[in-house]
Design a protein with these regions (language model features):
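Membrane-proximal cytosolic interface modules of multi-pass membrane proteins
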Residues: 1-15
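Short, acidic, metal-binding catalytic loop of nucleotide-sugar glycosyltransferases
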Residues: 14-26
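A conserved acidic beta->alpha catalytic loop
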Residues: 33-40, 56-57
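Catalytic donor-sugar/metal-binding loop of nucleotide-sugar-dependent glycosyltransferases
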Residues: 173, 182-200, 288
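Membrane-embedded multi-pass helical conduit in multi-pass membrane proteins
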Residues: 251-336, 352-370
Length: 370
């Protein structure tokens, strides 16, 4: 699927898809162009792949894929974001599991990135510390897999067509159509699997604003699912599966308490308001051991997937921006729209994003005043 990405971004994915090690008579490649661009249609014709453009654009990416499913007749569907370049071995590594397990509806592989995200670029940590998404595509998805609760992540996955048709195609009710789709598959009694071997590589978000915009969509979408199709209720899920889904949803609500902790000292410094009625020594005796224990425990469990110090940076930067939309989604899950993540951009020179930086500058100034 593609919407507004440059043709050069899509070309790499198509060329790599043509080179996948699989019988050519069983491999059908489609460009799903929601932008309806003539250059894309011409390119598809030149390289021998199929092309679909919609006349209407409802339900964004999910609607684009569902429209293509009307024409694609294969028993299995593999989906790649337009910037995710698959390896030659992708189908060889994933398809065998479907033959072994007839109830397997979806096989997910990691999202691996060959370019630095804004944190890695700005802090000079590319390939030196774990990527922000490494924790999810490492420990979290491995744990989900153990409890048969692997999430569909929208790309780099294979889905069996029959179960997908049974649930009406890709879910369109929320902006995280991928996780919602896997939830529906699990409710129908189908299984899923995760293979922690990268079989595709894509482009990380180039700018901090694009990165934050993507996380806002994920956060809002997971809270929408919690409100509209709560995994704690309804039929079809095992207890462990319910916990796995709720854990992912509650993670995105962490922005609210983090903002409270960031601003609580200022309430005392500026307004002399006591958040906790206790002497400073008693607070330190209770809080510091907990903080040290939590940090050491997380470091022990997460190991090479997420470092505690960098985790605080990731979560603090995002907290300002995911707290409002998640709160709104809790109150009104139908509010908001799907935001496309920009791909294929190139940051040619360093600059300060004053708009994104505004909350942090404001907090620093308040602390100085305090």
């Amino acid at each position: 699927p593609t919407y507004n990405e440059d043709l050069n971004v899509v070309k790499n994915t198509i060329y790599a898809s043509l080179g996948i090690d699989w019988p050519k008579d069983k491999l059908n490649i489609w460009i799903l162009d929601d932008g309806g661009r003539e250059e894309f249609r011409q390119f598809a014709q030149n390289v021998g792949v199929k092309y679909i453009a919609r006349t209407t654009h409802e339900h964004a990416k999910a609607g684009n894929i569902n429209n293509a499913l009307k024409y694609a007749k294969g028993e299995f569907v593999s989906i790649f974001d337009c910037d995710h370049v698959p390896t030659r071995s992708f189908l060889q590594m994933t398809m065998g599991w479907f033959l072994k397990e007839k109830q397997l509806a979806m096989m997910q592989t990691p999202h691996h990135f060959f370019s630095p995200d804004p944190f890695e670029r700005n802090l000079g940590r590319f390939r030196k510390t774990p990527n922000e998404g490494t924790l999810f595509y490492g420990l979290v998805q491995d744990g989900n897999d153990m409890w048969d609760a692997t999430f569909f992540c929208g790309s780099c996955a294979v889905i069996r067509r029959k179960p997908l048709d049974e649930i009406g195609g890709i879910a369109v009710e929320t902006v995280t159509e991928d996780a919602h789709t896997s939830l529906r598959l699990h409710r129908r009694g189908y299984t899923s699997a995760y293979m922690r071997i990268p079989q595709a590589a894509g482009l990380a978000t180039e700018s901090l604003s694009a990165h934050i915009g993507q996380r806002i969509r994920w956060a809002r979408g997971m809270v929408q699912i919690f409100r509209l199709d709560n995994p704690l209720t309804g039929k079809g899920l095992k207890f462990a599966q319910r916990l796995c889904y709720v854990n992912a949803m509650f993670h995105f609500l962490s922005g609210i308490p983090r903002l409270i902790f960031l601003t609580a000292p200022l309430a005392f410094l500026l307004l002399h308001a006591y958040i906790i009625y206790a002497p400073a020594l008693m607070i330190a005796l209770f809080v510091l051991p907990h903080m040290i224990h939590a940090s050491l425990t997380n470091s022990k469990i997460q190991g090479k997937y997420r470092h505690s110090f960098w985790s605080e940076i990731y979560e603090t930067v995002l907290a300002w921006y995911i707290a409002p939309p998640t709160l709104v989604a809790l109150i009104n899950p139908h509010k908001g729209k799907f935001n496309v993540t920009a791909k294929g951009g190139l940051v040619e020179e360093e600059y300060v994003d004053w708009v994104i930086s505004r909350p942090y500058i404001f907090l620093v100034l308040l602390n100085l005043v305090g």
